[in-house]
Amino acid sequence: MNQQYSAMRSNVSMLGKLLGDTIKEALGEEILDKVESIRKLSKSSRAGNEVQRQKLLLTLQNLSNDELLPVARAFNQFLNLTNVAEQYHSISPHGEAASNPVALAKLIERLKDKNFTNQQLKQAVEQISIELVLTAHPTEIARRTLIHKLVEVNTCLSQLDHDDLADYERTNIMRRLRQLVAQSWHTDEIRKIRPTPIDEAKWGFAVVENSLWEGVPAFLREFNEQLEESIDYNLPVEASPIRFTSWMGGDRDGNPNVTAEITRHALLLSRWKAADLFLNDIQVLVSELSMTESTPELRELAGGADVAEPYREIAKQLRTRLQVTRDYLEQRIKGQQSLPPEGLLIDNSALWEPLYACYQSLHQCGMRIIANGQLLDTLRRIRCFGLQLVRLDIRQESTNHTEALSELTQYLELGDYASWSEEQKQTFLLTELNSKRPLIPTHWQPSEATKEVFETCRVIAESPKDSIASYVISMAKVPSDVLAVKLLLKEAGADIRLPVAPLFETLEDLNNAESVMTRLFDIPWYRDLIDNKQMVMIGYSDSAKDAGVMAASWAQYRAQDALIKLCEKSGVTLTLFHGRGGTIGRGGAPAHAALLSQPPGSLKGGLRVTEQGEMIRFKFGLPQVTISSLAHYAGAILEANLLPPPEPKTAWIEVMDALSDVSCEMYRGYVRGEKDFVPYFRAATPEGELGKLPLGSRPAKRRPTGGVETLRAIPWIFAWTQNRLMLPAWLGAGAALQHEIDNGKQAVLDDMCENWPFFNTRIAMLEMVYAKADLWLAEYYDQRLVEENLWPLGAKLRQQLSDDIKSVLAISKDEHLMADLPWVAESIALRNVYTDPLNVLQAELLQRSRTHSESDPRIEQALMVTIAGIAAGMRNTG
């Protein structure tokens, strides 16, 4: 165990020393001494030395305005480098995640031990479907420029791990590391301007190019080797167990910056990047496929019997077509309208078929080893990414559709659609969906907002098939919300069979999800249309903000379970789409635990889940990390489908119902019922200041005024993470558990913890939150920033947190938090030494900026750096 971490710790101290050298060179010995003294005080403070803690507070309070920024930056950079060392450790020969792909092989052995036949395992493998949806919010807080440097630091750490390095090689690698650390130090870590949705889309494409492009075929190769070895099975070349979709440039819910034109632009960029990446692949194949022997069919395809190198000839033809495609898309991106040229690649089959013919011919001519090299990787990329690179989801809030149709029906003098009953709406929508004539008059001039809704549907209609993955309706409440989108698509000339996924996200909507879908399935026209396939999205963040984490997670479980049973009864294949974030308050949990804690049967229709902002970098930032993450997902799906978790016992359900009610009542009692809560929240956290951070393209609020309910879920969680109270991720949960213990339910809770992955994961997640929360820091924020009349509320919340930790330990039977996950505990402990000074500094900066009438750019800049640094320290933003 300790040896496992010693490699990581030595990398952390080496990178820390390089950073120290850089700071000394840039700012002199004095600043470095100050930083080093703060780090040592922080370490002693963490070890419980109260005298040193007071000294730490005084040192940071007495920094001059000129010293603030260098000190904040030093600790922020320490944390970035620590995260790199940790990410590298997870894939290094020393790290436990080095065994992830091996873990997959072990799982297959475990399944065989449980008497699953090779045939059953083969069927389960064939059903694996992983669709990861890349989203920008809460958006990666680190700049793309810095991320590239940190990725290269990772590469250097990997090179240093080779035992057989010559001295000069080691010297060169260390020199490069020094350069990268210095470059990072001299690069501004905070963006000066807010990214546009197109910037975000490009960030997504960069992840594909830098990591997924290599990582996906590499994972499939490893997975295939394990399957071959363990169950004598090869993944079919045409299998596409992994797909990527993006919300960047398609998610317009609450983001007025995402227009139809932006979506059109993002789709073109995506196709351009795909053509560019495939062109590189084909270029390699042109040089590799010099073989002459082929089947007669392939020779015919290459241009006849006279062609000496048929494989190369086919690759060259594709190269020409990809160049034509890339050039055409480049013109379109620049706004030049031109007719589609001859040879333009639109359909994946035009790229797939010639290359697959090469693959078959090589196999038939005894050149399997060549076929299974670069060519197989390219074929797998066509299946995973295709000519679209990533498909796009469109997301819009239901009220926008209602208002657009309302404007139309009033113009047509049919009445006001928005004021009709649900029955009237359905009658109107179904009549129009079955009508042969268009509904929209040619010369109608709607309002800008309505025009935008219709124009978005036109973009869908004009895009190549397979460019758009689904249309997600947020705040879906009734069947007409789904039918309305179908009608809008029909009127735009789009394919109305495009999956339309209602998103159920508040507590009430989750509780009503089954009834809404039942009514939808009862409509014969709808049942005929969907071909027995339905996608439903479950929202995690808004329900947690609405009702607290315990009530929300139970409502999510109940909704999923009810939908699974409804679809089984109705003969519909259900794909549940999980809108999770990286934080607990937004449904975050390690992938394996999260998937196994879902209701039985929830993964039969495949896994579709959002991967957000900074989590994309942690899980998919490097090809090796991608292999590891995909192995996690594949293993969890196999396990969940073959060894499903148990159906909850009646006693468990009763306890969960009680936990949900008690926790929701307590959560809402504070958040909505406590008159001082909102002023306390605004004073004790940097919520107001967060709005200034040029983070994502999306505004932080749905409406510019109002209380907690108008805040987006992400800033709400982000703000509480900053002051280390982590309130949204625990409030109500521990108190509800204690309530049930007091009601004599300890034995039932023990049974649930032991035998029910759903409950066990809830407890583990609470432990992780408690391990990251910090009472003394939260209290320090109160003392520096909150008016004295609000102190009792803060004290009450901290006491609640303290009591809750005891309640959870009574259930987990552990002596201390995270006893089962020493790796995570180690990781939190390692970062706390660097995060604590940033928290103290942030409270100091907030106090200075709020008491000074004029803004000081030094204070503002340092404040932004502490926000970024604490986010890196907590390893999640929102």
Swiss-Prot record:
Swiss-Prot/TrEMBL GO biological process terms: carbon fixation; oxaloacetate metabolic process; tricarboxylic acid cycle
Residues annotated as the enzyme's active site: 137, 545
Pfam families (alphabetical): PEPcase
Family annotation (PROSITE patterns): PEPCASE_1 (PS00781), PEPCASE_2 (PS00393)
GO cellular component entries: cytosol
Reaction catalyzed: oxaloacetate + phosphate = phosphoenolpyruvate + hydrogencarbonate
The protein's required cofactors: Mg(2+)
Keyword terms: Carbon dioxide fixation, Lyase, Magnesium
InterPro entries: PEP_COase (IPR021135), PEP_COase_bac/pln-type (IPR022805), PEP_COase_Lys_AS (IPR018129), PEPCASE_His_AS (IPR033129), Pyrv/PenolPyrv_kinase-like_dom (IPR015813)
GO terms for MF: magnesium ion binding; phosphoenolpyruvate carboxylase activity
EC number per UniProt: 4.1.1.31
Enzyme class: lyase
HAMAP family associated with the record: PEPcase_type1
Function text: Forms oxaloacetate, a four-carbon dicarboxylic acid source for the tricarboxylic acid cycle.
Family classification: Belongs to the PEPCase type 1 family.
Protein name (Swiss-Prot/TrEMBL): Phosphoenolpyruvate carboxylase
Originating species: Proteus mirabilis (strain HI4320)
Organism ancestry: Bacteria, Pseudomonadati, Pseudomonadota, Gammaproteobacteria, Enterobacterales
Gene, per the UniProt record: ppc
